[in-house]
A protein has these predicted regions:
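Extracytoplasmic ligand/sensor domains, especially the bilobed periplasmic-binding protein
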Residues: 52, 93, 108-214, 261-291
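Extracytoplasmic "Venus flytrap"
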Residues: 33-57, 87-92, 115, 184-192, ...
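Segments of small-molecule ligand-sensing domains
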Residues: 313-323, 334-404
Length: 426
């Protein structure tokens, strides 16, 4: 886990028990291209946990009978699955090239990947051009399906709109008195969308509150003392941040000693990944999100119990939300493949049949129920959860946990996030 790869192609081939009348070696593996950060600042908190989740899923699925029903069949409808894992580091141009390589050289059947919203925006039209089913597992910008229609591109996890709408709802409900707010977000699609959604919702709920400062930083900047000084000097009551990965960890490390979290109520919409690595640095009262019902907010169901047990056998750190997003997306792929088979294990469904099976579907996962109800059936919605940190007997715990139903924090089909928020969530 400590090894860093600048460019890695790791292939894991695990054979499953064949269905009656067939030998495992006669079955052509179903190849899944997995794209996640294996190097750089996002690798530790995001990429490596996601990679572990993918490997755990492959091992358990190929063994057969390990997952709860209806996911207990070996492989994908009897076919063993093979992972081709590559590094997401390097920027959008590199990722477009890597996607073409996965399809044209590695001959993958589907692609599961991408944490960066910039990467998702770049690869989506290329995946459509290549007619390769591509499941976006973690990026959050709602623009993917609001600005284009896709036949082959899906996102079986929710957008960041619900993160930030729910953040504003949570602040409005739990902070009785506040007059000012500020933000520190990354200056690209993810951070811009997150800030606009949070501020727009907050202003619709409390039009009298005033912005003190909005700090937009370069992705991966690493040093935030100038921005922290600007925020502290503006003395806001509420601070919103959608920082993730290494940027999030840097903000916590640099902000906590300067009382950034003491002088205001701070809400970290993607803060859950930091609680395992920085539990002692996160002050009590910090509002934390996990980009859905993931990690510490995941429901008690058979799929979650399976996942936690299998993951913890492979890692010293509990699964965080990038791990949940990865396994949820792989659940979607298995669900769609086997639905497209229609119970005929000898059938090899086409890409188009698998895509049709996932469009508009509802399936179960370690994070609960997932509905593909936006983006003409290609975009998922889920509930959103927030809670406040509190140290109890030396351990970080959560209080004031509130769960928001999917329909309360996601726009209706046919309406963009911006339109919905501008219309006061109506």
């Amino acid at each position: 886990m400590k090894k860093s790869w600048s460019r890695t192609i790791a292939t894991i081939l695990l054979f499953a028990t064949a269905p009656a009348g067939l030998l495992a070696q006669e079955l052509k593996p179903f190849k899944i291209g997995v794209v996640t950060f294996l190097s750089g600042a996002p690798a530790g908190p995001f990429g490596i946990p996601a990679k572990i989740a993918a490997e755990v899923f492959a091992e358990q699925v190929n063994a057969g009978g390990k997952l709860p029903a209806p996911y207990d069949k070996a492989g994908f409808g009897g076919r063993p699955i093979e992972l081709v894992v590559i590094d997401e580091a390097g920027g959008t141009t590199k990722q477009v090239s890597e996607l073409r390589n996965l399809v044209e050289q590695q001959s993958v059947d589907i692609v599961v990947g991408y944490t960066s919203s910039g990467d998702c925006l770049a690869v989506a039209p290329v995946a459509e051009e290549l007619k390769t089913m591509t499941l976006l597992f973690d990026c959050g910008t709602p623009r993917i399906f609001e600005e284009a229609d896709y036949e082959y591109v899906f996102r079986p996890v929710a957008t960041a709109t619900m993160d930030n709408v729910a953040a504003a709802l949570y602040v409005n409900e739990t902070v009785k008195t506040f007059a000012t707010y500020a933000g520190i977000n990354q200056n690209y699609a993810w951070g811009q969308d997150a800030w606009n959604d949070f501020e727009g919702t907050l202003k619709s709920l409390r039009p009298e509150v005033t912005l003190t400062t909005s700090q937009m930083t370069k992705l991966g900047a690493g040093q935030y003392n100038t921005e922290i000084s600007a925020i502290l000097g503006s003395k806001p009551d509420i601070i919103h941040s959608s920082f993730w990965g290494g940027d999030l960890e840097g903000l916590v490390l640099q902000g906590a000693p300067r009382d950034l979290f003491k002088n205001a109520t701070v809400i970290l919409t993607a803060g859950e990944t930091a609680i395992h690595r920085q539990a002692k640095q996160i002050p009590d009262g910090t509002i934390i999100g996990a980009r859905g019902p993931n990690g510490i907010f995941a429901p008690e169901n058979a799929y979650n119990e399976w996942f936690k047990t299998a993951y913890n056998a492979k890692s010293d750190t509990p699964p965080s939300y990038p791990s949940y997003h990865m396994v949820q997306t792989l659940f979607a792929a298995k669900f769609a493949y086997e639905k497209a088979q229609g119970g005929e294990l000898a059938k090899t469904p086409t890409t188009e049949e698998i895509a049709t099976a996932l469009k508009g579907a509802t399936f179960q996962s370690p994070s609960g129920e997932v509905k593909m109800s936006l983006g003409k059936g290609n975009q998922a919605v889920q509930e959103m959860v927030y809670g406040r940190t509190k140290t109890v007997n030396g351990k970080l715990s959560f209080v004031d946990v509130i769960r928001y139903a999917p329909e309360k924090v996601n726009p209706p089909e046919g309406m963009t996030s911006h339109e919905w928020i501008k219309n006061k969530l109506k």
